[in-house]
């Protein structure tokens, strides 16, 4: 006699989601030690099985080269033994972080004698949709496990072999440590149909977190029936005020743009107050040229570029809304601080904006008027990062206002519930 599974009549994606939901219920109440043991087992397994992972990754890299994929994307796709060791070290760092589950957010004894506590609890089943970055597979799994969640991973089809190998290693380590292996699963299928089904799995999946470019994020936000935490694109701005330290402004600009241009907290637009443009722009353009950055300038920047060694091209409307993720930056001269704020309000993705100024009044007004997750005063945009903020590892930078905003660490992968304890109290 054949015993039917309750999942037999479901699609592969739905089966995966149901198994994740069951696993989430099992791991939610586990003590920190059990979760940390699983994470340490994952780190060890990644190092022991490095050759298996690298071999699978080589398949993806070969296919990417045959398809004419850019070297930048291939670099993000590539896993080396050194990178795998770094990923394993990151997992151990997550294990060392405090467990947010069970933390009392607030509590008190009410006038009627009832004890009331608001405590952190896991979100449940977290779906991650991401592009060709196989390191995200491990990072997301580690953060979700530490916060007591099950995770459904849907990476780019271009990294399918890598992600399959990584999830196999993760599941073996998790199961071997005594936790349910189904707490970590790869969403089956390489087609967009599986992504659409995941986005419509409301009731099975508690939240979706997209990580990638603007097109991916927009698709998930617009088409998903599952609640989404939007890890937005990073169209970040640096505004150089009329009252400024020129050398500091150049240093902050170059660090914000050129230190690592392919990340979401890199600056994409430079705004310069007209009163300091003649003094600042020649310095800035030469420094940007030395860093290999192409400037997409408005007419005021172009007029001041004569004699500069910088590559300056005319800016178009599209430049103001572009997250380049490359050695390119848009630049404009503005009439006032308020004009800079107006430009930011119109074009920013709400990630990070910086002002460089010696005026406390200007800094105060800028921080009050700019509505982004992070507003930096005399500091690089590159500081918007969970590790830099002292929060530990992050799953992304949320640019929305509900549930989480800014770097999303372990606490942001939890919700809360209220514990009401009485002594026969009735109302």
Curated annotation (Swiss-Prot):
GO CC annotations on file: cytoplasm
Matches recorded under InterPro entries: Ald_DH/histidinol_DH, Ald_DH_C, Ald_DH_N, Aldehyde_DH_dom, G-glutamylP_reductase_CS, Glu-5-SA_DH, GPR_dom
GO molecular function: glutamate-5-semialdehyde dehydrogenase activity; NADP binding
Name of a matching Pfam family: Aldedh
Top-level class of the enzyme under EC nomenclature: oxidoreductase
Keyword NADP among record annotations: yes
Compartments (UniProt record): Cytoplasm
Any GO BP annotation: L-proline biosynthetic process
Domain of life: Bacteria
Entry's EC annotation: 1.2.1.41
Record field: catalytic activity: L-glutamate 5-semialdehyde + phosphate + NADP(+) = L-glutamyl 5-phosphate + NADPH + H(+)
Alphabetical keyword list: Amino-acid biosynthesis, Cytoplasm, NADP, Oxidoreductase, Proline biosynthesis
UniProt pathway annotation: Amino-acid biosynthesis; L-proline biosynthesis; L-glutamate 5-semialdehyde from L-glutamate: step 2/2
Predominant cellular place of this UniProt entry's protein: cytoplasm
HAMAP family per record: ProA
Family the entry assigns: Belongs to the gamma-glutamyl phosphate reductase family.
Chain's role: Catalyzes the NADPH-dependent reduction of L-glutamate 5-phosphate into L-glutamate 5-semialdehyde and phosphate. The product spontaneously undergoes cyclization to form 1-pyrroline-5-carboxylate.
PANTHER family (alphabetical): DELTA-1-PYRROLINE-5-CARBOXYLATE SYNTHASE (PTHR11063:SF8), GLUTAMATE SEMIALDEHYDE DEHYDROGENASE (PTHR11063)
Protein name: Gamma-glutamyl phosphate reductase
Organism: Streptomyces griseus subsp. griseus (strain JCM 4626 / CBS 651.72 / NBRC 13350 / KCC S-0626 / ISP 5235)
Upper taxonomic lineage: Bacteria, Bacillati, Actinomycetota, Actinomycetes, Kitasatosporales
Gene for this chain: proA
């Amino acid at each position: 006699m054949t015993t039917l599974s309750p999942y037999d009549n479901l699609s592969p994606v739905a089966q995966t989601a149901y198994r994740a939901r069951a696993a989430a219920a099992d791991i939610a109440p586990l003590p920190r030690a059990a979760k940390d043991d699983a994470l340490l087992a994952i780190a060890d397994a990644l190092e022991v099985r490095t050759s298996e992972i690298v071999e699978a990754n080589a398949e993806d890299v070969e296919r990417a080269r045959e398809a004419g994929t850019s070297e930048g994307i291939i670099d993000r796709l590539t896993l080396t033994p050194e990178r795998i060791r770094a990923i394993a070290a990151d997992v151990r760092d997550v294990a060392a972080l405090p467990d947010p589950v069970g933390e009392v957010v607030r509590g008190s004894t009410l006038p009627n004698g009832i004890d009331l506590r608001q405590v952190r609890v896991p979100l449940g089943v977290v779906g991650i949709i991401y592009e060709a970055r196989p390191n995200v597979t491990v990072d997301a799994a580690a953060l979700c496990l530490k916060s007591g969640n099950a995770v459904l991973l849907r990476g780019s089809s271009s990294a399918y072999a890598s992600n399959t190998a990584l999830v196999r290693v993760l599941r073996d380590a998790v199961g071997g440590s005594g936790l349910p292996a189904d707490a970590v699963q790869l969403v089956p299928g390489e087609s967009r149909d599986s992504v659409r089904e995941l986005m419509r799995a409301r009731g099975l999946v508690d939240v979706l977190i997209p990580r990638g470019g603007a097109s991916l994020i927009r698709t998930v936000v617009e088409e998903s029936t599952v609640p989404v935490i939007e890890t937005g694109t990073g169209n970040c701005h640096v505004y150089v005020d009329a009252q400024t330290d020129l050398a500091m402004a150049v240093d902050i600009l170059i660090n914000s743009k050129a230190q690592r241009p392919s990340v979401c907290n890199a600056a994409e637009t430079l705004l310069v107050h007209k009163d300091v443009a003649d003094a600042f722009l020649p310095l800035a353009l030469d420094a940007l040229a030395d860093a290999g950055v192409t400037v997409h300038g408005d007419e005021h920047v172009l007029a001041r570029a004569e004699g500069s060694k910088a590559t300056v091209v005319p800016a178009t409307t599209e430049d103001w809304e572009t997250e380049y993720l490359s050695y390119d930056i848009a630049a404009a001269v503005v009439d006032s601080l308020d004009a800079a704020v107006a430009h930011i309000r119109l074009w920013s993705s709400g990630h990070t904006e910086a002002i460089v100024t010696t005026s406390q009044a200007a800094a105060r007004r800028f921080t009050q008027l700019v509505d982004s997750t992070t507003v930096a005063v005399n500091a690089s945009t590159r500081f918007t990062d969970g590790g830099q903020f002292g929060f530990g590892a992050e799953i992304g930078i949320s640019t929305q206002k509900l549930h989480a905003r800014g770097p999303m660490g372990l606490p942001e992968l939890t919700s809360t519930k209220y514990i009401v304890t009485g002594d026969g109290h009735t109302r």
